[in-house]
């Protein structure tokens, strides 16, 4: 482990199933079938849902946020869609507010969006959030300018109503 500004980081050897996908061209360039590579891991306080365990062979169950690097895109929205989200959502807390602002842009927050500070905001591929939480499926059907809300235990509701949304 090594302490650097902003946290403690460690190294872990990665499985070849990840290396062949992430190390584009390295195997051809060096004319090798295997190359030892390591993942830089943050401490638990800085872990987020898109950080996979690269020491284990890739599978969509173990690394759902990376599914679209290996599988075809299955949603009726652009693959390069993004979401402005917050660190709480990226650390696994339940997303409770969603708005679709553009063809390929959403806001998705765990907690009240207006309470999210600029320092807590992140822009991430929407696929990361969709793959990490199956309950987010209805957000891909939102019309531009529409939103959904829920509390920690309820189903999705369109903004301005208390009736649930069909999945």
Q: What label would you give each PLM region?
A:
Residues 2-167:
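Acidic, proline/glycine-rich low-complexity IDRs
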């Amino acid at each position: 482990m090594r302490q650097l500004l902003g946290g403690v980081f460690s190294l872990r050897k990665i499985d070849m199933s990840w290396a062949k996908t992430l190390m584009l061209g390295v195997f051809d360039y060096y004319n090798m079938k295997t190359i030892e590579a390591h993942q830089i891991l943050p401490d638990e306080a800085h872990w987020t849902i898109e950080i996979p365990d690269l020491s284990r062979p890739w599978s969509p169950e173990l690394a759902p946020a990376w599914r679209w690097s290996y599988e075809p895109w299955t949603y009726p929205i652009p693959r390069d869609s993004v979401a402005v989200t917050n660190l709480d959502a990226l650390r696994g807390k339940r997303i409770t507010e969603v708005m679709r602002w553009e063809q390929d842009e959403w806001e998705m927050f765990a907690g009240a969006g207006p309470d999210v500070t600029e320092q807590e905001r992140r822009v991430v591929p929407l696929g990361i959030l969709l793959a990490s939480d199956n309950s987010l499926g209805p957000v891909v059907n939102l019309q531009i300018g529409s939103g959904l809300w829920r509390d920690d235990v309820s189903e999705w509701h369109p903004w301005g109503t208390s009736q649930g949304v069909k999945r």
